[in-house]
């Protein structure tokens, strides 16, 4: 067992983690722990762009962007955070440009911009060109650019170090972050990282769904680590289902395709979004478009022999436009479906895409232990966090913006905290939980298989907690997850070795997914309304009287060791925009 000491430790090396690292390393001795090589992080899969009211192509301003973000989040957005996001967006894009990111350009040389769902001119009058993009590889370009700048700044990376536990020490009645415990995949060794400040930037939770755009590594590791230590998770019932995933595979086809003029059609060739969103049409918010697609399918207007998908039609767009603006998704259509997008429409269906909920933070990235209390030395940014800038539904291109704006803020805040803070004493036997977990799983002779339990979890979530939900479907999910959690106690793995034990890694990840899926389902069951990505067919309307509030879920352990979930609620921060009916 090895012990390391740093001023700041960052968990995760995607966009938020590396943006934080660039700022933190300038101000404090920083280590970045990542279970992947940094450029394999899921930020690289983001395609469409990064929102900022640059007004390079059309009139725009940050206040319109703020309004669209609040409206898009179905008014569950904390508006102070939304204002910061929109105001700082312009500098965030220009910072990346200065770092070397190759944005697409207008003929006069400025950063080009295109339309994206839910982004509008003058508070909803018409779509606006706000998305700054690098073809349909924007996330990839951001990831590469940030990594190059991390290397330039001398950031210390610990690659393939899997953080399994958050260390909390109580000092004078105040719970403080003391560091993290990590498992080194190459050797099987346990490492303790003592740090004055810890930033979680470990990404989302989407692998508890089967049809998902998320990478295999998005298993909620950061959320699970802090949740086990008694800290809350916020708004976990809100999960975004992107309208255009490749049929049956879930691989993302960017919203930028519709921003460039792509059209959604049913089996009759009808542009059906005109019925559901007369102004924004195919560029309505993602929750609206995904529900519209499933409504078409349910009412018998789906495409194909089984009527289980619709079409994304790009055939009316010039091939040179597709090649220049959408090279990756046209290649995806050819590779995965054998379809030529120049001449044939692409079969699509909604895919689980993004967690709006996560570890609750304030606008500086400081983690909260309840509605207002900060955990000294603990920070989070990106999809792992809930600031809450996305509310009940995230707008496209606000994610790449979020990781840059709040990743930067968390990096600065954590480093500055480390200047004045002392190291917190480590708990007695700090690696006890991780050693017990690793050895129990590695030496288990149980009969349950990780792959079987994971498949049953994913099928349960797809069937019961996806775009449309009811009391009965959510209860079915809660009961099935409880059964799977019980069976997980008898899980066995084949590989008993220490080095690169991927069987062990997958077993640990499954445990995280089971914990978080239960939180999501229990939170969804309690929210008896429809709002954004959470749609209850038995409660189809938004209820601002009873549910204009954030859900806070806490893990509680009884004297007999039984676990339960306690739900509490936190008020929404409203500054200038009062809730209205959402129309697109």
Regions inferred by a protein language model and the residue ranges of each:
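Glycine- and aromatic-enriched mobile tails/lids
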Residues: 1-6, 15, 23, 37-39, ...
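N-terminal Rossmann-like FAD-binding beta1-loop-alpha1 element of flavoenzymes
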Residues: 8-32
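Glycine-rich active-site loop/strand segments that organize a redox cofactor
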Residues: 52-85
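Short beta-strand to alpha-helix junction loop
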Residues: 77-90, 129-148, 158, 212-220, ...
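Conserved redox-cofactor binding core of oxidoreductases
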Residues: 97-189, 194, 201, 242-249, ...
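Glycine-rich loop(s) and the adjacent beta-strand/alpha-helix scaffold that form part
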Residues: 197-251, 304, 396-413
């Amino acid at each position: 067992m090895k012990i390391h000491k740093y001023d700041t430790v960052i968990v995760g090396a995607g966009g938020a983690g590396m943006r934080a690292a660039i700022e933190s390393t300038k101000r404090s001795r920083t280590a970045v722990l990542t279970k992947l090589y940094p450029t394999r992080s899921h930020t690289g899969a983001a395609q469409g762009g990064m929102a900022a009211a640059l007004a390079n192509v059309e009139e725009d301003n940050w206040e319109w962007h703020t309004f669209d973000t609040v409206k898009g989040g179905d008014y569950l957005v904390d508006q102070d955070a939304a204002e910061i996001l929109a105001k700082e967006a312009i500098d965030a894009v220009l910072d990346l440009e200065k770092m070397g990111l190759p944005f697409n350009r207008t003929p006069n040389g400025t950063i080009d911009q295109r339309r994206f769902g839910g982004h509008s001119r003058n508070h909803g009058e018409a779509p606006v060109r706000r998305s700054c993009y690098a073809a349909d590889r924007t996330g990839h370009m951001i990831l590469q650019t940030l990594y190059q700048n991390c290397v330039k700044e001398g950031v210390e990376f610990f690659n393939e170090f899997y953080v399994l536990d958050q260390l909390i020490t109580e000092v004078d009645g105040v719970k403080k972050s003391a560091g993290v415990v990590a498992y080194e995949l190459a050797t099987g060794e346990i490492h303790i990282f003592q740090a004055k400040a810890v930033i979680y930037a470990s990404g989302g939770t989407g692998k508890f769904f089967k049809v998902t755009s998320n990478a295999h590594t998005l298993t909620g590791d950061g959320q699970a680590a802090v949740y086990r230590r008694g800290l809350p998770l916020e708004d976990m019932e809100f999960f975004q289902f992107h309208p255009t995933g490749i049929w049956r595979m879930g691989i993302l086809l960017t919203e930028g395709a519709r921003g460039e003029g792509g059209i959604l059609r049913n089996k009759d060739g009808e542009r059906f979004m005109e019925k559901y969103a007369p102004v924004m049409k195919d560029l309505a918010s993602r929750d609206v478009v995904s529900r519209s697609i499933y409504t078409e399918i349910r009412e018998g207007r789906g495409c194909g022999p089984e009527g289980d998908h619709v079409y994304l039609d790009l055939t009316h767009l010039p091939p040179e436009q597709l090649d220049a603006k959408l090279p990756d998704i046209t290649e995806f259509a050819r590779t995965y479906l054998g379809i030529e997008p120049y001449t044939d429409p692409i079969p699509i269906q909604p895919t689980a895409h993004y967690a709006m909920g996560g570890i609750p933070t304030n606008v500086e990235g400081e983690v909260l232990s309840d509605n207002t209390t900060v955990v000294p030395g603990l920070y989070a940014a990106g999809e792992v966090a809930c600031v809450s800038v996305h509310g009940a539904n995230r707008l496209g291109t606000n994610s790449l913006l979020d990781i840059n704006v709040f990743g930067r803020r968390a990096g600065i805040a954590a480093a500055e905290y480390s200047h004045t803070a002392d190291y917190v004493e480590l708990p007695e036997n700090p690696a006890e939980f991780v050693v017990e977990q690793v050895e129990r799983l590695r030496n288990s002779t149980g009969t349950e298989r990780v792959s079987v339990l994971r498949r049953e979890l994913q099928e349960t979530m797809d069937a019961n907690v996806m775009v449309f939900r009811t009391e009965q479907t959510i209860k079915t999910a809660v009961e099935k997850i409880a059964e799977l959690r019980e069976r997980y106690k008898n899980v066995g793995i084949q590989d008993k070795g220490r080095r690169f034990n991927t069987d062990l890694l997958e077993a640990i990840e499954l445990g995280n997914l089971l914990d978080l899926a239960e939180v999501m389902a229990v939170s969804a069951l309690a929210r008896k309304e429809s709002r954004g990505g959470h749609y209850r067919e038995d409660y189809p309307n938004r209820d601002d009287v009873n549910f204009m509030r954030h859900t806070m879920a806490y893990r509680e352990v009884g004297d007999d060791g039984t676990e339960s979930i306690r739900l509490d609620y936190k008020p929404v921060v409203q500054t200038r925009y009062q809730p209205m009916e959402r129309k697109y």
